[in-house]
Each structure stands twice: as C-alpha cells, then as structure tokens.
Amino acid sequence: MKFPIYLDYAATCPADDRVAEKMMQYLTRDGIFGNPASRSHKFGWQAEEAVDIARNHIADLIGADSREIVFTSGATESDNLAIKGAAHFYQTKGKHIITCKTEHKAVLDTCRQLEREGFEVTYLAPKSDGLVDLDEFRAAIRPDTILASIMHVNNEIGVIQDIEAIGKICREHKVIFHVDATQSVGKLPINLAELPVDLMSMSGHKLYGPKGIGALYVRRKPRVRLEAIIHGGGHERGMRSGTLAVHQIVGMGEAYRICKEEMAEEMAHVTKLRDRLYNGLKDIEETYVNGSMEHRVGSNLNISFNFVEGESLMMALRDIAVSSGSACTSASLEPSYVLRALGLNDELAHSSIRFSLGRYTTEEEIDYTIDLVKSAVKKLRDLSPLWDMFKEGIDMSKIEWSAH
C-alpha cells in the first residue's frame, strides 16, 4: 500500500497509463505533431484525423454526434462558453437565467458576471438532500427566461439531479438547458440522443485524461446558437478559436474510449468500496452523510463528523488525501457554500470530509481509511470540551457564549 492514499478523485485523476502512452505519440518530430488546421500537407492531415477519431470517442460515450463536440481548455471554459455564449446570443428574447445555489463556481461566477451585464439570475435553493425541487424550478420560469444551468452530479456531495425531468420542463417552456456533467460523464450512462439537454460541459482530467482539455456538447437539432467568447482563426466551427492541442485531445479521446468499455465494471467496483467505507464509518456517533444516499454517484461519500473541526481532522488524516469542500475552495477556511445551501449549520459544514474513490482504489486502502478515521475522530473528540458537554446532555444551542 502506497502512502498517502489518494481518495480525492473528484478533484482530479491521474492519467491512465494507456492515455499517457497515446499522448506521447503526438508531441515529438517522430510522431504526429502537425497542426490540424494545416490542410496542404500530410502532417496536418494526420493531426486532423487524430482529432476526428478523438471527437468520435467522446461523442460515442455520451450518445452525441461528433459534430456536436467543441473542444475547450476544460470544463470551466465550457461552462463559460455555454452560459455566456447562449445568454449573449439570445438576449433579445429575454435576460433571465435559472441556476442552483450548489452549482460549481464556474457556473455561479459566470452568472454573477452576467448579472453585472444586466441579466437577472434566479438561484434556486436545493432541498436538504441536495436535489432541486422540480416544482420550484418550474415556478421560477418566466416569459423572459432564456437559459437554465443545472449540474448533473455535484462535485462535493455527489448527488445526481434528475436532468431528464428538468430538461423536459425546459423544453415545454422553450428554455435552453445547460448541464455541467464534469462529475457524471464516465460514471453514469448518458445518452444525449434521448436526454433533453442542449449544452453539456465535460472535462478530460476527471476521467483519467490530461488536464487542460475539455469539451462542450452543443446540440444541432434543435439547433442551439452560441456567441463565441474567444475570437481568432474560427476553429471549432467559429465557437472556440485557437490551434487545437492535438496531444491533449487525443488523450481525452482515449480516456473516453476506455471509459465506454470499462465504465460498468469500474463503477460496480468503486460503488462496492464506497459502500464498504460508508458501512465502516456510519456507526461513529454524531456522524451525518451530506446529500441523498439514494440519488448519489457511486464514487462519492461526504460525511460530517460533529464536534470535530474539519481542518484538525484533515491534519490527523495525513495518510489519506481527502478534501473538505471541493478542491477549488478547499484552501479557504469558509464553510462549504454547498453544505450551507443544504441547511447545515457552520459547525457541521466545517466538520465535513469528502471521500471520492476511483479506478485505482483498493479494499485494503478503504479498510485502512476506516480505522484511521475512527481513531482520529475519537482522539479529537477526547480533546474537545464541546464533546464532553454534549455527552453530559447539555443543549449547545441554548448556551450563551461570552465574547472576549
């Protein structure tokens, strides 16, 4: 067993060896290093063919047409292109957007920027299990609503939104529907030939591909139009200019190809280990799972350990790589905005740990993690006067703490 044990796959995944090997063939002069936009010689043709093959692999995994795949620098850019691109293109029809308070920052901050430009955004509060209330979503739609953005799987709590039902509501009201599928592609079956989704963001590195590459699915029928946010040579059908990073695209394509072949087996393995972890930790007193266990991706477990400070617990768990909150916000000492949106108090939000499992997680690592977490929580609670008071039956909420 190698230390520290990596249980932060929702932050990033190592590139699969097969992906890294494939990418190396597109970097040096012995390989295929051409610019796919060079149409007058073999170097360009070979590079273009490699990009086309990768585009097909990505489309195959999600049930799309390869012409609906636009390459970007990652899911953050895909979110920006989808939301800003659609908002700017359709703003003559209306300037109202709907999203959820638990979305990724790439969606929330993009919406905030649009608010500064004069758009109006409704931020829906999720139910306590993390799911969007469909009646509330329907009620939020106005005649001037042009776009809704709801993520498929949450990066912190792993809950799966019913994007089919939300998409149907959007179709009824002719609202464009964007889905951030960064955490669901390769973990859940997705068939865009059937799902009522217009725009979908994807990442390379969350599926054992390289960092710095992502894609945006843009529906052709019914056609969705976007205004570009990066201008230049008109690459990617004018939606995203810039020389295509062939080695990155090939890496992402290979990662998606592998996922299509191995997803069912891999998710069964990961879910079994996640359940083993959950069963090992659920009996610790004052332990709460954040988000629905029923509608949850198999790789995620987010637990709050009451009366334990999250940062102290992280330090006590030096042998395992986990996070409190998401990787994008885990450096801040603010409690997770996702958990606060579920209605958790600051104490519980602060004491949460996200375990995210992946392709290379083993049973041995999970058993070690269970033992380590149990002993760390016990040790920290033994040092906590709050835990003593709780055990004595004192109601914490009724105590008036004096300020010094």
Swiss-Prot record:
Keywords: 2Fe-2S, Cytoplasm, Iron, Iron-sulfur, Metal-binding, Pyridoxal phosphate, Transferase. [2Fe-2S] cluster binds at C328. Gene3D superfamilies: Aspartate Aminotransferase, domain 1 (3.90.1150.10), Type I PLP-dependent aspartate aminotransferase-like (Major domain) (3.40.640.10). Its EC number is 2.8.1.7. The active site is at C328 (cysteine persulfide intermediate). GO terms for cellular component: L-cysteine desulfurase complex. Its main location: cytoplasm. Its cofactor is pyridoxal 5'-phosphate. It is found in: Cytoplasm. It catalyses: (sulfur carrier)-H + L-cysteine = (sulfur carrier)-SH + L-alanine. GO terms for molecular function: 2 iron, 2 sulfur cluster binding; cysteine desulfurase activity; metal ion binding; pyridoxal phosphate binding. One of its GO terms (biological process) is [2Fe-2S] cluster assembly. It holds the Pfam family Aminotran_5. The modification N6-(pyridoxal phosphate)lysine is found at K206. Pathway: Cofactor biosynthesis; iron-sulfur cluster biosynthesis. It is an enzyme of class 2 (transferase). InterPro entries: Aminotrans_V_dom, Aminotrans_V_PyrdxlP_BS, Cys_deSase_IscS, Cysteine_dSase, PyrdxlP-dep_Trfase, PyrdxlP-dep_Trfase_major, PyrdxlP-dep_Trfase_small. Pyridoxal 5'-phosphate binds at A75, T76, N155, Q183, S203, G204, H205, T243. PANTHER family: CYSTEINE DESULFURASE, CYSTEINE DESULFURYLASE FAMILY MEMBER. Belongs to the class-V pyridoxal-phosphate-dependent aminotransferase family. NifS/IscS subfamily. Homodimer. Forms a heterotetramer with IscU, interacts with other sulfur acceptors. Master enzyme that delivers sulfur to a number of partners involved in Fe-S cluster assembly, tRNA modification or cofactor biosynthesis. Catalyzes the removal of elemental sulfur atoms from cysteine to produce alanine. Functions as a sulfur delivery protein for Fe-S cluster synthesis onto IscU, an Fe-S scaffold assembly protein, as well as other S acceptor proteins. This is Cysteine desulfurase IscS. It comes from Mannheimia succiniciproducens (strain KCTC 0769BP / MBEL55E).
